[in-house]
Amino acid sequence: MIDKTAFIHPTAIVEEGAVIGANAHIGPFCIVGPDVKIGEGTVLKSHVVVNGHTTIGRDNEIYQFASIGEVNQDLKYAGEPTRVEIGDRNRIRESVTIHRGTAQGGGLTKVGSDNLLMINAHVAHDCTVGNRCILANNATLAGHVSVDDFAIIGGMTAVHQFCIIGAHVMVGGCSGVAQDVPPYVIAQGNHATPFGVNIEGLKRRGFSKEALHAIRNAYKLLYRSGKTLDEVKPEIAEIAAKHPEVQPFYDFFARSTRGLIR
């Protein structure tokens, strides 16, 4: 179903069964598959391919040669009807690739809202990208990676399968991330190691001086005290009890499956 207010360029191919919302714009030479839903006001600039069971929300801008919802690169994939879901107000730049999930990995690749995916960024099968994240040019997420809200992944950076990038993290360019990065941390290098707290990013997002001080103290306990994770957990829990901004930092320890960067 194509809304009567949507624009479809004469050279675009929109297959029967696709749903195109009000005021959406499908530009020249785009291809939209039969199981695709595109929300109100979303713009496909030109030469964009959207395939598979893919749902895209409203007011997104998707630039030329982006490929969304195509078959993933997992050799176990056998054609199952897995999905891609994309939220609202994302900017997906040239040649970005977002692959559908796998049956073994939950069947869903998900991108939230208000993200910027720069040129050539790759989001592999079963990844989850939160809200207000930035993947810079050529940033690559392997399968099953989670990127939490407000995280920034620098250009040419690769993230290993199943890694978790915490909220408000900044990973510097040309890095290789092979373990989980706790919230608020700056990481850099191959393999990525911690370089402090993302103070400037947190200031821009309105964190108070007291919260920043508490987060720094938690960071120092984890990375500068010389103690094991089990030893510092109770101390960080005490800080989190007084400063709720530290709670996500503490909770991340239980989420981690690949171990924390060191």
From Swiss-Prot:
PROSITE patterns: HEXAPEP_TRANSFERASES (PS00101). PANTHER family: ACYL-[ACYL-CARRIER-PROTEIN]--UDP-N-ACETYLGLUCOSAMINE O-ACYLTRANSFERASE, ACYL-[ACYL-CARRIER-PROTEIN]--UDP-N-ACETYLGLUCOSAMINE O-ACYLTRANSFERASE, MITOCHONDRIAL-RELATED. The keyword Acyltransferase applies. Keywords: Acyltransferase, Cytoplasm, Lipid A biosynthesis, Lipid biosynthesis, Lipid metabolism, Repeat, Transferase. One of its GO terms (cellular component) is membrane. One of its GO terms (molecular function) is acyl-[acyl-carrier-protein]-UDP-N-acetylglucosamine O-acyltransferase activity. It is found in: Cytoplasm. InterPro entries: Acetyltransf_C (IPR029098), Acetyltransf_C_sf (IPR037157), Hexapep (IPR001451), Hexapep_transf_CS (IPR018357), Lipid_A_LpxA (IPR010137), Trimer_LpxA-like_sf (IPR011004). It catalyses: a (3R)-hydroxyacyl-[ACP] + UDP-N-acetyl-alpha-D-glucosamine = a UDP-3-O-[(3R)-3-hydroxyacyl]-N-acetyl-alpha-D-glucosamine + holo-[ACP]. It comes from Cronobacter sakazakii (strain ATCC BAA-894). Homotrimer. Pathway: Glycolipid biosynthesis; lipid IV(A) biosynthesis; lipid IV(A) from (3R)-3-hydroxytetradecanoyl-[acyl-carrier-protein] and UDP-N-acetyl-alpha-D-glucosamine: step 1/6. NCBIfam families: lipid_A_lpxA, PRK05289.1. Belongs to the transferase hexapeptide repeat family. LpxA subfamily. This is Acyl-[acyl-carrier-protein]--UDP-N-acetylglucosamine O-acyltransferase. Its EC number is 2.3.1.129.
